[in-house]
């Protein structure tokens, strides 16, 4: 049943490859802050879905400040003209968290073809545009190897091609050592809203093995 384990959650920890998406300390108000983090992520992802956001990291160094790091394929969509969009986002977060010190950092994802979240979103976008699911999956696989990926697995589930009966189809190329803890495996999901219903997309990308001199966040 090892394939059923989330590749991210399996590797989260200070001595492993993956770090936490939320960094905070709270004894009594953990639940409130956790819900705030979920709302902030939903706000960012829903407001800037065209930016193809990979990851939203939220840090709370103190009770009075919050630092939000956004990794995206198209950072200009989030920033907007003369920084208008990011100012609106900052005010919305200030209103939501009641904090005056809100810092937002935008980072561009350069190797987006080996970023599982962006690859999954790209495939979902193509499915919504009625591109063949097989073509979308094979294109993503080829692009990932060109940017240094060592293995990729892509899965699509739903009424593929408008079929009456839902099914799951997947392709795998290269290595995918899901049981190896030192393996750097990126995993993400996305949904394509089509006229036939929702199609789920899952992507696993193997980038190589973790070494003592190299840590992925």
Curated annotation (Swiss-Prot):
<comment type="subunit">
    <text>Part of the 30S ribosomal subunit. Forms a tight complex with proteins S10 and S14.</text>
</comment>
<comment type="similarity">
    <text>Belongs to the universal ribosomal protein uS3 family.</text>
</comment>
<dbReference type="GO" id="GO:0022627">
    <property type="term" value="C:cytosolic small ribosomal subunit"/>
</dbReference>
<dbReference type="InterPro" id="IPR036419">
    <property type="entry name" value="Ribosomal_S3_C_sf"/>
</dbReference>
<dbReference type="InterPro" id="IPR018280">
    <property type="entry name" value="Ribosomal_uS3_CS"/>
</dbReference>
<keyword id="KW-0689">Ribosomal protein</keyword>
<dbReference type="GO" id="GO:0019843">
    <property type="term" value="F:rRNA binding"/>
</dbReference>
<keyword id="KW-0699">rRNA-binding</keyword>
<dbReference type="InterPro" id="IPR015946">
    <property type="entry name" value="KH_dom-like_a/b"/>
</dbReference>
<dbReference type="InterPro" id="IPR004044">
    <property type="entry name" value="KH_dom_type_2"/>
</dbReference>
<keyword id="KW-0694">RNA-binding</keyword>
<feature type="domain" description="KH type-2">
    <location>
        <begin position="40"/>
        <end position="110"/>
    </location>
</feature>
<dbReference type="InterPro" id="IPR005704">
    <property type="entry name" value="Ribosomal_uS3_bac-typ"/>
</dbReference>
<protein>
    <recommendedName>
        <fullName>Small ribosomal subunit protein uS3</fullName>
    </recommendedName>
</protein>
<dbReference type="InterPro" id="IPR001351">
    <property type="entry name" value="Ribosomal_uS3_C"/>
</dbReference>
<keyword id="KW-0687">Ribonucleoprotein</keyword>
<dbReference type="InterPro" id="IPR009019">
    <property type="entry name" value="KH_sf_prok-type"/>
</dbReference>
<dbReference type="GO" id="GO:0003729">
    <property type="term" value="F:mRNA binding"/>
</dbReference>
<dbReference type="Pfam" id="PF07650">
    <property type="entry name" value="KH_2"/>
</dbReference>
<comment type="function">
    <text>Binds the lower part of the 30S subunit head. Binds mRNA in the 70S ribosome, positioning it for translation.</text>
</comment>
<dbReference type="GO" id="GO:0003735">
    <property type="term" value="F:structural constituent of ribosome"/>
</dbReference>
<dbReference type="Pfam" id="PF00189">
    <property type="entry name" value="Ribosomal_S3_C"/>
</dbReference>
<dbReference type="InterPro" id="IPR004087">
    <property type="entry name" value="KH_dom"/>
</dbReference>
<dbReference type="GO" id="GO:0006412">
    <property type="term" value="P:translation"/>
</dbReference>
């Amino acid at each position: 049943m090892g394939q059923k384990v989330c590749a991210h959650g399996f590797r989260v920890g200070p001595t492993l490859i993956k770090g936490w998406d939320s960094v905070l300390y709270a004894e009594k108000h953990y639940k409130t802050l956790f819900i705030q983090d979920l709302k902030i992520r939903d706000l960012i992802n829903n407001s800037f879905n065209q930016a193809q956001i990979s990851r939203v990291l939220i840090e709370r160094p103190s009770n009075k400040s919050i630092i939000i790091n956004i990794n995206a394929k198209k950072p200009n969509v989030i920033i907007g003209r003369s920084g208008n969009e990011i100012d609106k986002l900052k005010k919305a977060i200030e209103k939501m968290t009641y904090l005056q010190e809100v810092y937002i950092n935008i980072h561009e994802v350069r190797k987006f073809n080996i970023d599982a979240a962006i690859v999954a979103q790209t495939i979902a976008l193509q499915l919504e545009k009625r591109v063949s699911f097989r073509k979308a999956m094979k294109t993503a696989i080829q692009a990932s190897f060109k940017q240094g990926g060592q293995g990729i697995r892509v899965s699509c589930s739903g009424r593929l091609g408008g079929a009456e009966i839902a099914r799951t189809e997947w392709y795998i190329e290269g290595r995918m050592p899901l049981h190896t803890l030192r393996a750097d495996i990126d995993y993400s999901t996305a949904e394509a809203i089509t006229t036939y219903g929702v199609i789920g997309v899952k992507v696993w990308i193997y980038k190589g093995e973790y070494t003592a001199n190299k840590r992925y966040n």
